[in-house]
């Protein structure tokens, strides 16, 4: 029996061959040699050796060689002089031919795989050159045109943000100034309203005084009328009394004429009349003077109140006009303030939207830059992996070259002619017991490489009997 040990390689792992993956940082090589020796109990003993080579990373490509060794003699064995049966030689030739046919088929498969491998290596080298060119372009040019466009757009966005910030600050200053003007106008309006209230209260007091003066004038007019009526009544009464006195005087005069000895009453009546006339004139003069003084006082008070009322009306009209103008101005300022606040809100909303758009653009550009960096890092990792694979494939190519050279040298050896073999008969009874078990020698060689350098190499020998 023979054993073939096959390990998975990076080539099969990369290009679809069977096997499992290994670490990319280190490689291990295994060399397994299996040797079998068969004892046939005669002078002819075929020996078959199989060698398997596994290269990094864990790949295995096997070739096997078969040789037929003839031993003319065995120590302690006596050979017969007769010819051996050629059926054994025919069987050996058939096995040898089958082995050669299988080896040719395997060699053809290996050649096909090797050609595919070379094509893939060339393709990978072209891809590697493209990646190297891109990497050199990225490293050599520094900032690409896309980066310049991004930076230019970022500068433009920053300039717009600064301009909007300045506009916002200017609008806020204007708003503060307008707020101060509005506060000052409100204070002035409050003062004008207070003055208006004071003027209205003064006007109300003046109206009260005018009403009182009017009532006093009416009262005085009624008093004057009553006094005039009283004067007329007194005058009429006085006239009647005078007439009565005159009538009495006439009667008395007649009696006096008739009676001379009676006292003179005319003088007494005249004195009484003079006294009454003086009293009436005095009362009339005092009443007229009091009436004139009262009328003059009331006229002066009425004129004074009329002047104050007219002045109060003028001031009230002036205050009303001022209040109306201030109200219109306040309404205009309110409208201006509302429009400015609306514009400021719109500008703030636009600024917030533009700032959000700028932030989104900045985030998108940063994401694109990060993606480009990650893609560059991925290309670098792929490039490093390809370098590792290339080194491993170079090692496998060198191994294949050695195997092919060994196979070519083996094929070039002359084959023995089994038909001319003459074997002597061996007395098996007198021969010592020969071990019919096959001997297998297993050589395990472990080579660990990292970045193309051998860092560890171990060999193990195992001898087994079957």
From Swiss-Prot:
Gene3D superfamilies xref list: 1.20.5.170, Single helix bin (1.20.5.500), Vasodilator-stimulated phosphoprotein (1.20.5.1160)
Residue numbers carrying N6-succinyllysine: 120, 129, 188, 294, 445
Name recorded for this polypeptide: Vimentin
Keywords: Acetylation, Cell membrane, Coiled coil, Cytoplasm, Cytoskeleton, Glycoprotein, Intermediate filament, Isopeptide bond, Membrane, Nucleus, Phosphoprotein, S-nitrosylation, Ubl conjugation
Positions of post-translational Phosphoserine modification: 5, 7-10, 25-26, 34, 39, 42, 47, 49, 51, 55-56, 66, 72-73, 83, 87, 144, 214, 226, 299, 325, 409, 419-420, 430, 438, 459
Function: Vimentins are class-III intermediate filaments found in various non-epithelial cells, especially mesenchymal cells. Vimentin is attached to the nucleus, endoplasmic reticulum, and mitochondria, either laterally or terminally. Plays a role in cell directional movement, orientation, cell sheet organization and Golgi complex polarization at the cell migration front. Protects SCRIB from proteasomal degradation and facilitates its localization to intermediate filaments in a cell contact-mediated manner. Involved with LARP6 in the stabilization of type I collagen mRNAs for CO1A1 and CO1A2.
Species, as recorded: Canis lupus familiaris
Protein modification: Filament disassembly during mitosis is promoted by phosphorylation at Ser-55 as well as by nestin. One of the most prominent phosphoproteins in various cells of mesenchymal origin. Phosphorylation is enhanced during cell division, at which time vimentin filaments are significantly reorganized. Phosphorylation by PKN1 inhibits the formation of filaments. Phosphorylated at Ser-56 by CDK5 during neutrophil secretion in the cytoplasm. Phosphorylated by STK33. Phosphorylated on tyrosine residues by SRMS. O-glycosylated during cytokinesis at sites identical or close to phosphorylation sites, this interferes with the phosphorylation status.
Positions of post-translational N6-acetyllysine modification: 120, 129, 139, 168, 188, 223, 235, 294, 373, 445
